[in-house]
């Protein structure tokens, strides 16, 4: 049995490209991809570079996952629901929570029979009025739920600083 021996100088922070395990190759919270079932790339070469995250597609595409964004002027949620028709989806607001529910009964696909159901809940930010929330379904099966954020109640203003002649902190009397 061969045992890989790594020199201590390779494990130092100056060499972040070398990882003795697959820990750094994992995308936590995401499902397994086909490439995860093949041997670890780090076992094939000690100088494996993990591709930067900006080269990967957003994690919610093709995974059934969602992406929640809070931008300067709006709040939005994108959710992959390509396996559901509009009639099989419900979006509702209960208090400060958006609930998305999807369900379809058993149907046949290329692998046999399948039924699906999911529930997702998203907290509405305090500066978004629940009455202004809308939803739409794109042709590629992405459900978008969004609402405008309230702007600050007035224009920005600079507050002048005044100088006082007395100290803010006075010494306590000695006993």
UniProtKB/Swiss-Prot annotation:
Keywords: Acetylation, Chaperone, Cytoplasm, Eye lens protein, Glycoprotein, Lysosome, Metal-binding, Methylation, Nucleus, Phosphoprotein, Secreted, Zinc. Glycans are attached at residues 41, 170. The modification Phosphoserine is found at residues 19, 45, 59. GO terms for biological process: negative regulation of apoptotic process; negative regulation of DNA-templated transcription; protein refolding; response to heat. The modification N-acetylmethionine is found at residue 1. Residues 56-164 form the sHSP domain. The modification N6-acetyllysine is found at residues 92, 166. It comes from the Eukaryota. Its main location: cytoplasm. SUPFAM superfamilies: HSP20-like chaperones (SSF49764). It holds the Pfam family HSP20. Residues 142-175 are annotated as: Disordered. It is found in: Cytoplasm; Nucleus; Secreted; Lysosome. Gene3D superfamilies: 2.60.40.790. GO terms for molecular function: metal ion binding; protein homodimerization activity; structural constituent of eye lens; unfolded protein binding. Zn(2+) 2 binds at residues 104, 106. InterPro entries: A-crystallin/Hsp20_dom, ACD_alphaB-crystallin, Alpha-crystallin/HSP_16, Alpha-crystallin/sHSP_animal, Alpha-crystallin_N, HSP20-like_chaperone. GO terms for cellular component: cytoplasm; extracellular region; lysosome; nucleus; protein-containing complex. Belongs to the small heat shock protein (HSP20) family. Heteromer composed of three CRYAA and one CRYAB subunits. Aggregates with homologous proteins, including the small heat shock protein HSPB1, to form large heteromeric complexes. Inter-subunit bridging via zinc ions enhances stability, which is crucial as there is no protein turn over in the lens. Interacts with HSPBAP1 and TTN/titin. Interacts with TMEM109; in the cellular response to DNA damage. Interacts with DES; binds rapidly during early stages of DES filament assembly and a reduced binding seen in the later stages. May contribute to the transparency and refractive index of the lens. Has chaperone-like activity, preventing aggregation of various proteins under a wide range of stress conditions. In lens epithelial cells, stabilizes the ATP6V1A protein, preventing its degradation by the proteasome. This is Alpha-crystallin B chain. It comes from Sus scrofa.
